[in-house]
């Protein structure tokens, strides 16, 4: 049986993932990461310029893909003929949700780091960014409904973000 040898980058990533998952980005110690890999902090800087750059190497590609997947679904829906949007909403929304959940579960550790361990990085606002995208799309859709002669009641702007983060959960329960 052949023993698998990890490259230095792989060992850094493995140690960083453990440290970030245990302590979160802010409390994670770069010294602990490099020490567990058996290298110096100076040697680490030959690979990454900062602890945040290391965190970005672990989660950045997945974060960007996830947000892009969500934006694409919103854009695809908005590009449908207006008269088709009401009937197509549930299908497009459900398909997008399934794809996003599937992707997140395929990369569960990464999304745990993004959702629970990213405070102090540009990645800590995933849910907020998605809510903003959803708000913008919803406002555009409300205009489409009004154009089709199906106006909806005015939504209190202070309650919109709360309702969007909870509405889908409620809808799927019942």
Model feature map: region roles:
Residues 60-65:
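Short, basic, alpha-helical segments at the C-terminal edge of helix-turn-helix-like DNA-binding modules
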Residues 91, 95-106, 119-148, 158-161:
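Amphipathic alpha-helical packing segments from all-alpha helical-bundle domains
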Residues 57, 71-103:
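Hydrophobic alpha-helical connector segments
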Residues 11, 15, 19-53, 57-58:
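Helix-turn-helix
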């Amino acid at each position: 049986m052949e023993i698998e040898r990890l490259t230095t980058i792989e060992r850094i990533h493995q140690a960083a993932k453990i440290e970030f998952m245990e302590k979160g980005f802010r409390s994670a110690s770069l010294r602990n990461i490099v020490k567990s890999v058996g290298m110096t902090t100076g040697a680490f800087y030959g690979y990454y310029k900062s602890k945040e750059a290391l965190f970005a190497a672990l989660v950045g590609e997945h974060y960007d893909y996830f947000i892009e997947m969500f934006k694409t679904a919103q854009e695809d829906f908005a590009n449908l003929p207006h008269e088709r949007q009401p009937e197509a909403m549930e299908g497009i929304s459900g398909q997008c949700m399934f794809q996003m959940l599937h992707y997140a579960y395929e990369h569960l550790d990464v999304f745990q780091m993004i959702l629970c361990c990213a405070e102090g990085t540009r990645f800590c606002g995933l849910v907020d960014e998605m809510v903003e995208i959803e708000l913008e799309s919803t406002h555009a859709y409300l205009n489409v409904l009004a154009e089709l002669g199906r106006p909806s009641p005015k939504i209190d702007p202070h309650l919109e973000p709360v309702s969007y983060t909870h509405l889908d959960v409620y809808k799927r329960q019942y």
